[in-house]
Every structure is written in structure tokens, then in C-alpha cells.
Amino acid sequence: MDDVVVVGGGLAGARAVERLRGEGFRGPVTVVAAEPHEPYERPPLSKDLLLGKDTDPTALDPAWWEQHDVTLRVAVRAIQLDRGARRVHLDSGEWLHYDQLVLATGAEPRVPDLPGADRALYLRTLEDKDRVLAALRPGDRLAIVGAGWIGLEVAAAARTHEVEVTVLEMADLPLEKVLGAELSGHLAALHRSHGVDLRTGVSVQEVLLGPDGPVGVRTSQGTIDADHVLVAIGAVPAVDLAREAGLEVDDGIVVDERFRTSDEHVSAIGDVANAWNVRLQQRLRVEHWDNAIRQGRAVADVLLGRDTVHDWLPYFFTDQFEFSMEYVGRPGPHDRVETRGDVEGHEFIAYWLDAAGEVTGAMNVGIWDVNDRLRALVGTRVEPADLTDLRQ
Ligand code: FAD
């Protein structure tokens, strides 16, 4: 392997180049990053940074790049791939040659096809965070479209700023597909107990605009006045570069268990990659922090000739009011949930079990340093009587 180019200066790209150098690769390495920042972690954007805490989200020490002779090109976008000549065209006009190209272009907020939606707030970047934080003035009214993880995290942060928050969710319960009815009901109750006006079974039809921007939303249940509107209805993978270069795209860039596209010189990792998981025997596109880190490191290992494959279970975490949790696994839609511990006190473990009694996923809420034990349980058969909150 000669020169490596990584397109995308997010967490996955940062961890890939960190690993390449950490494992002794000495060839030229360049990261092309569209944002005007060094790679940073996004989870604090909807948590500590939105609460006004002084948290540094930077993924690598600023001195690291020079110390490790990795070229970081910020505020530069890759606009075209010439796979035949193995080069990337940048919006600065240059062409960069690669021997191995890693696409780590991440995802972008989904913008609904509704009047006015392009004028709403979204949350993906540091600049977005600044805009959302500026909107969190005590007494202001914030309408949040979508009760997914980001929408609910922003709702929690906004209530801490004493903002009047209305959350509008199309489904009957927030995050029911992930948590199941009982636990999503628990989360909904928690938000309501903190003054969030969480409305479910409601569809948003328009973001209403005044002369200075959004002034509310029109919904299937009437109009809601607001000073700010945030749309948080998920993300779409940034696949344009790959698609235009003729690579297979199907809900992300399609890659095998070693993150390779059909072109042996091009890999894809992180939020943009729809990668075959050998353990779960299915293709997965995972939009989580842990996945970006693991795939970044793993693709470096693959490029260095190691026998590394995508075989780990998805993991993620959230913090909303008193509900702080880690979640591991991939339960099926019909798996049943068993809880152990104090659900009302937000200190419990939830286990997902399939029809055969095998653990398919688990979540530790307010109980820490147990997620590795839960991960080890996934895929094993456990008698319900043997499931505990792991605290004794
Ligand atoms: P990204 O972080 O999206 O980075 C991709 C980068 O590539 C971007 O900077 C983009 O500008 C750049 N790029 C795209 N196209 C080009 C191009 N053509 N040329 C150059 N650069 C390009 N996960 C959790 O597990 N727990 C959490 O609590 C959590 N909280 C989150 C909160 C927020 C607000 C957000 C937005 C995400 C959160 N996530 C969380 C998800 C997690 O942050 C992502 O999974 C992770 O950032 C993915 O990293 P990535 O490097 O694959 O992509």
C-alpha cells in the first residue's frame, strides 16, 4: 500500500488514520474534511455542549496531525472520484492520488419534503449546535419535529434552559421500535414529568414561516406556535460521491465484512457504510459513535493486511434528564423485554429475549461498568430467573 486518502473528517476517518499511524504505516496519509474543523465527536452536540458545559469534542489532539505526518485538509470537499486513475477531485481544484481510498463521509440530517422545512433548525455540526443553543432562551417556545434520540436529547437540554418545549412524533410512542412499548412509555412519561409537551400520533405538514423564519408548525392536530422549530427526523448517508463514481449504493455505500466496495482500492466506514456483519449475518448501516470508532480502526487493520472483520454488536448511549443508558445488541421486532432493578428510579437493566430464550440485546440504565458483561450475554440462552440487575 502506498498513499492513503480518507474522504470525510469525522470520527470514523480520524480513528482510521490514528490506527494506521499507530500500527506503523509510514506512507503518505491525507484526510479531506469538508467542515472547517478538525474531526470532532458529535454526541456532546446534543448533550453537554447544549447544556452550556465546557466540553472539548475534538477527536485528536491538535498536535497529533503534525507529529504523525498526516495531512489534514479542512474546509475542502471531495467532489469527484476518478477510479480509473485512482484520484480524487477536490473543490479547491486539485486532484489527489490514492492507492487506497477510504470513504467516511458520514450522514446528513434528513430534510422532510414539507413547505418551510428548509428554514428549520437541524443538529449535526458545531455550527448547528451554536444555532440551536442560541435558540434556547428561557421562556422561548421550541417545537421539535421527531422524538428520536436527538429530538429527545435536545428536548431535555431545552427544558434545562427553561424553554417551553413541544415534541411532535408521528408514531404512538417515541422510539418504540428500539425500546418496546413499556420502556418507550417510561421515557415518554419522564419527558412529560419534566414539562415537555410530547404529542404522539401527530404528523407535521408545514413549518410556518414569518418574515424572520419559522413561527410554528401546522400539524394533523392543528397549529402550534413556536419561536423556533427543530427538525430531527433522522439522517441520510452522504453517498453522492460514491454513487456518481459507480459504486453500489443501497441505504449507504455497500461494503463487505472488511469494508471493501466492489473496487479493491475503495473502502467505506462509519455512518455512510452499509457493511456486512458476520456475527449477525446481515448488512448493517449503524449511525453510532462506537461504530464509527470501531470501523475506523478496523479498516486500518484491513488495509494493513490483518484478518479483521465486522463482527461486533451495535452499541450506543444516550443521556436525557435522569435517563442515562448504554444499549448493546440487535433485538428483533418481536423479542420480549425483561427488566431487572428499579425502573421508576432509572436504575435498571433491560434484557431483550427472542422466542428461544436467547438474549438479543440489553440496556443498562443508571448502572455503570456492566455493558461488557451484557455484551457477553448477547447470543446466549439465559433463564429469566437468572437475569439480574448485576448489582449484587
Ligand atoms: P460524520 O460524523 O458524519 O463525519 C463525516 C464527515 O465527512 C463530516 O464532517 C462531513 O462534512 C464530511 N464529508 C462528507 N462528504 C464529504 C466530502 N465529499 N468531502 C469531504 N468531507 C466530506 N451516537 C451514539 O452512539 N450516541 C450518541 O449519544 C450520539 N449522539 C449524537 C448526537 C448528535 C447531535 C449527532 C449528530 C450524532 C450523534 N451520534 C451518537 C452519532 C454519531 O455521532 C455518529 O455515528 C458519528 O459521528 C459518525 O461518524 P462518521 O465519521 O461516520 O460520520
Range-by-range predicted roles:
Residues W368-P384:
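A short, polar/charged loop-to-alpha-helix boundary motif
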Residues R141, I150-E206, W312-F317:
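Rossmann-like dinucleotide-binding cores of NAD(P)H-dependent redox enzymes
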Residues D2-D3, V272-W368:
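Mid-to-C-terminal Rossmann-like scaffold of FAD/NAD(P)H-dependent oxidoreductases
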Residues D2-T71, A157-L179:
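Beta1-alpha1 glycine-rich phosphate/pyrophosphate-binding loop at the start
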Residues G8-L11, R124, V145-I150:
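Glycine-rich Rossmann-fold phosphate-binding loop(s) that bind the pyrophosphate
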Residues M1-V5, T58-A143, T219-S220, L230-A232, ...:
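FAD-binding core/adjacent interface of flavoenzyme oxidoreductases
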Residues P384-Q392:
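Cysteine/selenocysteine-centered motifs that mediate thiol-based redox chemistry or coordinate metal-sulfur cofactors
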Residues D118-G139, L209, G213-I293, A298:
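FAD-site-proximal beta/loop scaffold in flavoenzymes
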